Each structure stands twice: as C-alpha cells, then as structure tokens.
Amino acid sequence: MKKILVIIITVFMVAGCRNMDSFTISGKISDPQKKNIVLNRVEVDRLVFIDSIKVKGNGSFRFRLKAEHPDFYQIGYSDTDFITLLAAPGEKISMTFRGKNTSGDYEVTGSKGSEDVRMLDLRLAEGKRKLDSLRTVYGNLEGDQASMEERTRLEDEYTSVLQNLRKKNIEYIVTNPSSIAALKAVYQRIDENTYVLYDPR
C-alpha cells in the first residue's frame, strides 16, 4: 500500500513539474475564415515564429509550448490579424473568437496576464474609435461662429478621451507594478507617433 502511495505521489509530482514548464492554448473560432492559426513570440524588436496549426472542422485548435517564464505572444491568422497574449508556465489558456477575424471579438480565460492585456487592448481600441469619430466631425465643420463653439467643444472632448485613457493606464501600472502586462500599458500608442502616456503639457 505504501509503495502504491509513493508511486502515485511521484507521478503527480512529475506531472506537476511538467505542467509548470509549459502552457497550453486551446481555442474555438465560431466562423473560421482560414485554415491555419499562427503563433509568434513577441520580442523587443521582432516577432519569432513559434508554430502554425490547422484549424479543425469544428473551429477548434490547440497549442502546447515549453516556457521558462511569462512572455508576450501574438496569435491569429496573420501579422495584421491577431491578438496578444501574456502566457506563463503552468497556464491552461482557453480562447473563443466570435467573429470572422481573430483581431475582433474574443474572450480569454485561464491567464490573468492575458485577461489584463485584453482589457487594455479593448479599452485602447474603444478610445481610438472615439478619437477617430471626433476627428471626422471636427473636419466636417464649417468656419462660422457656431462651428467655432462646436470646435472648442470637440477639442475639449478629444482631450478628455486622451486624459481618461492616460489616467486608466497609469492606474493599472500603479496597481500592478509586478505584472508584465504593465509594459503593455506603458507602450500603448494612439498612433504611430503618440504614446497613450505622452502628455504634451
């Protein structure tokens, strides 16, 4: 009996160690448009190809990777249609994509870092949509006195959206100083030349 117990404990310990040096990503795409899903690791100045797998007929896919520490990854159809994960050893990440694009509506569980990255990305996307809408309205105004008042209102609203994004990112960084996801909050951009945290004042 003791020998059996020792064997069982050993098996669980080995399995536990094996699980802690790898992570899995299991996903389901409700409307798969392409055959393959690509996984890249994000490094400072480049993407490193990790794997590409075929999406099954029911829209499911699964990756299993060796990992020694948390890292950012891009998963999606291409370099322009993807989402970002922050995967750590031992995690069992589950994903659901609801649209035609992997960069669209999705859910992720089983990874606190990836859930936080999703929150940051969705908040930025919503902020950028508001800013784009304000730019469009602003550009369509005519140059009369009434439009001058409207311009001022739109400029104030534009500034308010930027300040709110900046405030939320700072709050996340301050409350999650040990999370690698805080790096995402630091380096998010409104456009190619403007960081969310940049304040011109």
Where are the model-predicted features located?
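Sec-dependent bacterial lipoprotein signal peptides
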Residues: 1-15
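A short structural micro-motif
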Residues: 14, 161, 189-192
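A non-transmembrane, solvent-exposed segment enriched in polar/low-complexity residues
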Residues: 17-167, 171-172
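Amphipathic alpha-helical repeat scaffolds of TPR domains
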Residues: 178-192
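Alpha-helical repeat scaffolds
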Residues: 199-201
